């Protein structure tokens, strides 16, 4: 059994954004192996995301981003307005807009299968991670992409 220090737990927390106790439990289970602990935390995140799927997410935000001649607008829902005001939630929504502009998916299902803007994971995996970190159901309700100039 590895000797887990507070520094180890803090480093894992800094990498993942997940609570100290969850990080400590994952490190103990992984016998101090940080990469294995991250895998354990991802698996737990997926399980928690599935458990929260039936909840109602009626709050949230609508955001818009323009890059060149491409504009994207998205609605992302959360269970409470408190989460909608959270900086990491808002950053996630901005990154979703960047992902939409880069990939131009046809619908929400295609967006979920797209590579997230960081290139390391899919949008679906990042969404599950956000649900685990924030602790509430988060759902991508809808989005639209306008390519070119709109005239009225």
Segments the model singles out, each with a brief description of its role:
Residues 2-152:
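N-terminal assembly/interaction segments in proteins that build large macromolecular machines
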């Amino acid at each position: 059994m590895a000797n887990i220090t507070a520094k180890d737990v803090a480093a894992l927390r800094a990498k993942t954004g997940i609570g100290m106790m969850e990080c400590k439990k994952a490190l103990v289970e992984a016998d101090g192996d940080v990469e294995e602990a991250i895998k354990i935390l991802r698996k737990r995140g997926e399980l928690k995301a599935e458990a929260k799927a039936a909840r109602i997410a009626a709050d949230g935000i609508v955001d818009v981003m323009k890059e060149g001649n491409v504009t994207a607008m998205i609605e992302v829902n959360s269970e409470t307005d408190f989460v909608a005001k959270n900086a990491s939630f808002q950053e996630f929504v901005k990154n979703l807009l960047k992902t939409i502009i880069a990939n131009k998916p046809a619908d929400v299902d295609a967006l979920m299968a797209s590579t997230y803007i960081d290139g390391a994971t899919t949008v679906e995996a990042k969404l599950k991670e956000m649900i685990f970190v924030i602790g509430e159901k988060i759902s991508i309700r809808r989005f639209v992409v306008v390519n070119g100039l709109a005239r009225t």
